[in-house]
Regions:
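Sec-dependent bacterial lipoprotein signal peptides
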Residues: 1-35
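Acidic, polar-rich low-complexity tracts and alpha-helical solenoid repeat scaffolds
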Residues: 5-9, 33-313
Length: 313
């Protein structure tokens, strides 16, 4: 069959050119999509067709036959509104879309899980739907140097999960992925701060690093934030503020590539000469407290020179 299709496409290309091949391929894809969107067939005489469909859909889902599974589940949702499997079938549709792993299917999965939570808010598997909704955004997260919109959406959905379902059995798994999600966002902010640090724009670096620690105090790679924040503070002549950051690095991390440098920087700060603190004073008070030798003195007159008063001619 494939050989025949190849020969046909080759013939089209010779006669009508590349455009004919493109049109033929698009038509074939559309036809395949239409077949996939059709309803699943039920053997004649099946006593409980919804049970049959759900079992076949679950079997296909476990075998990662995403489109086949979706056909079975979608048929239940659309044809058997009173079925006890309808809610689970709705989740099955979402799972099959997530399984495909394309950007388009993940967007569709988000819609399916949102609809489930809207139609079945008190269902026993509502926590599962909320968890999968967060994961649908998680799978779309960009690299740290790219836009983090999906990362923020994932964090928001995980927060809703923890708030609504604090005792869910899915909580440990959700916490693991939530940590990865927050690390992605914090890593993105940290890299901006590191860019400023390397460009020697220390005020901007300090602001970014402090923001990371404020928003995500459990950031996995915060040892790097502690160290570069401390360096920037020292560069800005604020060593006293660097000491607590370096101390946290040493106390919180038994293993870190920054430990040796942190100890060195701490030692340098502690051994640096102490600058006396000066307090602003009024000009008159400053003048009063100056030693006598430092005060401005009138110019001395040479005794050999006599200054005569001017007289009018």
């Amino acid at each position: 069959m494939m050989q025949g299709m190849t020969r046909s496409l080759a013939s089209l290309g010779r006669i009508f050119g590349p455009l004919a091949i493109a049109v033929s391929l698009l038509a074939g894809a559309a036809g395949a999509g239409a077949c996939a969107a059709g309803k699943a067939k039920i053997p004649a005489g099946t006593a409980q067709p919804d049970n049959f469909l759900y079992e076949r859909g679950t079997e296909a889902l476990n075998k990662k036959k995403w489109m086949t599974a979706r056909e079975y589940f979608q048929t239940i949702v659309e044809t058997y509104p009173q079925s006890t499997h309808r809610a689970d079938a709705k989740l099955g549709v979402g799972d099959s879309l997530l399984g495909e792993g394309t950007a388009a299917s993940q967007i569709q999965a988000i819609q399916e899980f949102r609809e489930f939570l809207s139609f079945f808010p008190t269902h026993a598997r509502a926590d599962y739907a909320q968890y999968k909704l967060a994961m649908a955004h998680y799978y779309q997260m960009a690299k740290p140097e790219r836009d983090q919109t999906e990362t923020r959406e994932a964090i928001r959905e995980f927060d809703i999960f923890f708030e609504r379902y604090p005792n869910s059995k899915l909580r440990p798994e959700a916490e693991k992925f939530d940590r990865e999600t927050r690390d992605r966002l914090s890593e993105s902010e940290y890299r901006v701060g590191l860019f400023y640090h390397r460009a020697r724009w220390y005020p901007g670096a300090i602001d970014r690093f402090q923001q990371v620690l404020k928003n995500d105090p459990k950031f996995t790679n915060r040892d790097a934030v502690y160290f570069y924040l401390s360096e920037a503070l020292v560069k800005m002549n604020r060593p006293a503020e660097a000491v607590p950051q370096l101390t946290k690095l040493v106390e919180e991390f038994e293993v870190s590539e920054f430990l040796d440098d942190a100890h060195k920087l701490l030692t340098e700060i502690k051994n640096a000469p102490v600058q006396p603190a000066s307090t602003p004073k009024a000009d008159g008070e400053k003048e009063k407290q100056k030693p006598e030798a430092e005060k401005p003195k009138p110019a001395k007159q040479d005794p050999a020179v006599t200054v005569k008063p001017k007289t009018n001619p």
